[in-house]
Regions:
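Phosphate/pyrophosphate-binding loops at sites that engage ATP/ADP/AMP, CoA/4′-phosphopantetheine
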Residues: 72-88, 280-297, 316-321, 325, ...
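Condensing-enzyme catalytic core mediating Claisen C-C bond formation in acyl metabolism
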Residues: 6-62, 176-277, 281-284, 418-494
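Acidic, glycine-rich active-site loops and adjacent beta-strand->loop/helix elements
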Residues: 23-25, 93-99, 134-140, 163-168, ...
Length: 494
C-alpha cells in the first residue's frame, strides 16, 4: 500500500528541482589578450573594450576534456561531501570528446570513482548511468534538462552534470581571440539550495552549417606528393598512386586517410545570425508557455557567451522589443529624443546609439555584466560557458554582498548546428555558499604565458607541461599494447 502511494507521489506531486551545488576547474595558464592583439596587429581596444576580452585560458599539454571534467566533478564531491550512493546520473556536455565510441563521461566517472574508493569502495559509482551529450555549445543544457527529468522521477537521488570543453581555433583566424577552456560541474537535486528551475523550456532547432567539426579526408597519394616536395623531390600524383597501391604499413591499405582536429569550420557572421534567429524563436516558444517580459521579470540574464560582450551586443534589439511590449517605450523615446526611424539604415544607427545610452548600460550592468566578468578572463568554454556565467553571476553578487534570494534568472543557451533553449530559475536561500568557491581569486592566481609559448602549445610542439606541479587529474599518455592502442591513461596528484 505504501509503495503504491509513494509511486503516485513521485509522478504527480509538484516539487522544486534545480541546482543544488556548483564546482569548476579552469587551467592554470592563460594568454593575455593584449599579447595576442600585439602579435596579430589588432587594436587592443577593439578586443578589450569592444568584445570584453582580457585573457583566455588554455589547457596544459597534460589536460583534456576528461581531466578537466574529472577535476570539476571531484571538486563537487569534496566540497559538498556527496555520498556516491545518492548519485544516479553523470551526464557530460562536451564538443571536445576524446573518442567516437567510448563516452568521455566514462573516463571521468572512472577517475572520480578511483579517488572516492578509499572512503566509499572501489565500485561506489558502479550504478551511476553515464553518457555524453553533444550539440555544440548547448550539450550541457540538454544534460541539465535530462538530469532534472531524472530527479523528478527519482527524488531520492541526485544527478551530476558536467560541462567540459576546449575552444580552439586556427591561428590567425577571427575565432582565435575567443578561445578558452575549463569545466563546470553541477549537482541537480530536489529542494535545491542554489536555484530552483522552472518546468517550462522554450526550444528552437534548425539544421545549419554555421559551425562544425568534420572528419577531414586526405588521399595518401596527396600526402606522399607533399612529403616528397618537403624532401626536395618531385613526384606526380599518378606516381604516388602507384606507390601507395603497392605499399604496406601506413601507406598501404585504405586509400583515404581521415583525420580530426579541434579547430572548427565556421562562419562567424552566419553563426551570429543563427544564434539570434534561434534565440528569437526559442523566446517566442517560451512565451507561449510562460507569461513573462524578460526586461521586467528577469533580474539576471545568463546566456552562452562566445565572447564576453556577446550578450549585451545581441540583446539590444530584443530589449527594445521587450520595452515596447511592456508599455515603457516612451521611456526609450525620451532617452533618445526621438522615436525609432522607419528607414532601415537610420534605424540601425538609432539602435546603435541606444546601445551606448546610460539607460541601456544600466540594464547591462544589472542583468548581464555579472556573467561577463568570468568570461572576460577565461574566454569561450563552449558547453561550460553558460554555467560559468551563472557561477560568475552568483560569485559577483556574493563579493558585493548583494541579496539574491528570490531573484529570477533567465537562461538562454545556444549550440551551433543549431539549437537554442530558453528557461528560468529562482535563486534559493542557500545560494551564497557559491562565494566560498573563490572563483575570481582563483582566476587572479593563474600564470600568464608569452605569445611564443602559446603558439608552441597551439601547434602541439610543447614536450613538457607548463605547470608540472599541478594537483588533480592529468593525462599521462596513450597505450600501445595490442587491442588497447590509443586508450588514454591518467594519474592523480594530491
Amino acid at each position: 500500500m505504501n509503495r503504491v502511494i509513494f509511486c503516485e507521489l513521485k509522478t504527480t506531486a509538484r516539487m522544486k528541482i534545480g541546482i543544488d551545488a556548483l564546482a569548476y576547474y579552469v587551467p592554470q595558464q592563460y594568454l593575455p589578450i593584449e599579447a595576442l592583439a600585439q602579435a596579430r596587429n589588432i587594436e587592443y581596444a577593439k578586443l578589450h573594450k569592444g568584445l570584453g576580452l582580457t585573457s583566455m585560458s588554455f589547457p596544459d599539454v597534460d589536460e583534456d576534456a576528461a581531466s578537466m571534467g574529472a577535476n570539476a566533478v571531484l571538486n563537487l564531491f569534496n566540497a559538498e561531501q556527496l555520498d556516491p550512493s545518492h548519485v544516479g546520473r553523470l551526464y557530460l556536455g562536451t564538443e571536445s570528446a576524446l573518442d567516437s565510441a567510448k563516452p568521455t563521461a566514462t573516463y571521468i566517472l572512472d577517475l572520480v570513482e578511483q579517488q572516492l574508493a578509499g572512503e566509499y569502495g572501489s565500485d561506489c559509482l558502479r550504478n551511476v548511468d553515464a553518457v555524453d551529450m553533444t550539440f555544440a555549445c548547448i550539450g550541457a543544457v540538454d544534460a541539465l534538462e535530462n538530469a532534472c527529468l531524472y530527479v523528478r522521477q527519482n527524488p531520492e537521488k541526485k544527478a551530476i552534470i558536467v560541462a567540459s570543453d576546449l575552444a580552439k581555433y586556427h591561428l590567425g583566424s577571427t575565432g582565435e581571440y575567443t578561445q578558452g577552456a575549463g569545466a563546470v560541474a553541477i549537482a541537480v537535486a530536489v529542494d535545491p539550495s542554489i536555484i530552483s528551475l522552472g518546468d517550462e523550456i522554450g526550444v528552437a532547432t534548425k539544421g545549419e552549417r554555421d559551425f562544425f567539426k568534420p572528419r577531414r579526408t586526405h588521399t595518401k597519394a596527396e600526402l606522399l606528393v607533399e612529403a616528397a616536395a618537403l624532401l626536395g623531390q618531385e613526384l606526380s600524383m599518378e606516381e604516388a598512386e602507384i606507390k601507395v597501391t603497392s605499399a604496406e604499413g601506413f601507406w598501404g591499405g585504405n586509400r583515404i586517410l581521415r583525420s580530426y582536429v579541434e579547430e572548427p569550420v565556421f562562419d562567424g557572421q552566419y553563426s551570429n545570425f543563427a544564434y539570434i534567429s534561434r534565440i528569437s524563436e526559442a523566446l517566442d516558444h517560451f512565451g507561449t508557455k510562460v507569461n513573462i517580459n524578460p526586461a521586467l521579470d528577469w533580474d539576471k540574464v545568463v546566456m552562452h557567451l562566445p565572447y564576453a560582450f556577446q550578450g549585451r551586443r545581441m540583446l539590444v534589439n530584443f530589449y527594445l522589443d521587450w520595452m515596447q511590449a511592456n508599455g515603457k517605450w516612451q521611456d526609450v523615446v525620451s532617452v533618445m529624443g526621438s522615436d525609432k526611424p522607419a528607414d532601415k539604415s537610420e534605424a540601425k544607427e538609432w539602435v546603435r546609439a541606444f546601445s551606448k545610452s546610460d539607460y541601456y548600460r544600466s540594464y547591462v550592468a544589472k542583468a548581464l555584466a555579472p556573467a561577463e566578468r568570468a568570461s572576460s578572463l577565461i574566454g569561450n568554454m563552449y558547453t561550460a560557458s553558460i554555467f560559468m556565467g551563472l557561477l560568475s553571476t552568483l560569485c559577483d553578487a556574493a563579493d558585493k554582498g548583494e541579496a539574491m534570494e528570490g531573484q529570477t534568472v533567465g537562461f538562454m543557451g545556444y549550440g551551433s548546428g543549431s539549437k537554442a533553449k530558453v528557461f528560468q530559475g529562482t535563486v534559493e536561500a542557500g545560494w551564497a555558499k557559491v562565494g566560498q568557491l573563490n572563483l575570481f581569486t582563483a582566476l587572479e592566481n593563474r600564470s600568464a604565458v608569452d605569445f611564443k609559448t602559446y603558439e608552441l602549445w597551439h601547434n602541439e610542439r610543447l614536450t613538457a607541461p607548463l605547470s608540472p606541479e599541478k594537483s588533480g587529474f592529468t593525462f599521462t599518455g596513450l597505450r600501445t599494447e595490442e587491442n588497447q592502442e590509443y586508450f588514454r591513461d591518467y594519474t592523480f596528484t594530491a
